[in-house]
Amino acid sequence: MRSPRDPEETAWHQVRRLGYSPDDVRHIFLTHLHLDHSGGLPDFPIASVHIFRPELEASLRPRGLLRWIYPHEHWAHGPRWVVYDAPRPGAWFGFDAIETVAGLDPEMRIIPLVGHAPGHCGVAVRTDKGWLMHCGDALPFGGLASSPPEAISRLLIGPHVPRLRALALEQGERIRLLPAHVPLQKLTGWKGQVET
């Protein structure tokens, strides 16, 4: 997988295209801190960065190959970490969940999906059309329809694909699941189903 090389694809430029200033970004919820997910943090120096404690701890003390995956220069500017612990078992459609900081709108949950990274999480947001859950790298790039064989899936992205598939089937239009690395145009419009 390659990181975007076109500056227009960066979050900073996308925020500007939407008519906002990067200083308007007050909160960033990361699924994990791998280099391909945290590279834009310095572009939003005043934002609070929300993260699950096991992921922050793994990134601050990486060992072996993880030193390359967790580049400290992405958070050398000293972000304001908002660190989450202790998910409530089964609190969100049977998944363990953590309620985010009180007062944030819309309602959000952090859903631990550990496997791809030590503290990997999904981020679920309640919308007027149901829940939208950014599954990060716990879901294959092409969504559930493109799942690799289970053994490969478990090795690369963790053990959650079968549960996420069951959630999508049980809840239908009430929950929309999105993988990481989805082109921006795929994020527009409500399909009422898992993105494929």
Residue map of PLM features:
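Active-site metal-binding loops of divalent metal-dependent hydrolases
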Residues: L33, E55, G115-A117, D137-A138, ...
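Metallo-beta-lactamase
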Residues: R2-Y20, D24-D36, R53-I111, L155-R174
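Active-site beta-strand termini and strand-to-loop segments that position acidic
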Residues: G103-P106, A124-D128
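Short, conserved loop/helix-junction motifs that constitute active-site signature segments
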Residues: P42-P45, H74-W75
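Cap/insert and terminal regions of metallo-dependent hydrolase folds
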Residues: M1-H13, D128-T196
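Short hydrophobic/aromatic-enriched beta-strand-loop microsegments
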Residues: S48-R53, H134-G136
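Active-site-proximal beta-strand elements of phosphoester/diester hydrolases
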Residues: M108-V114, M133-G136
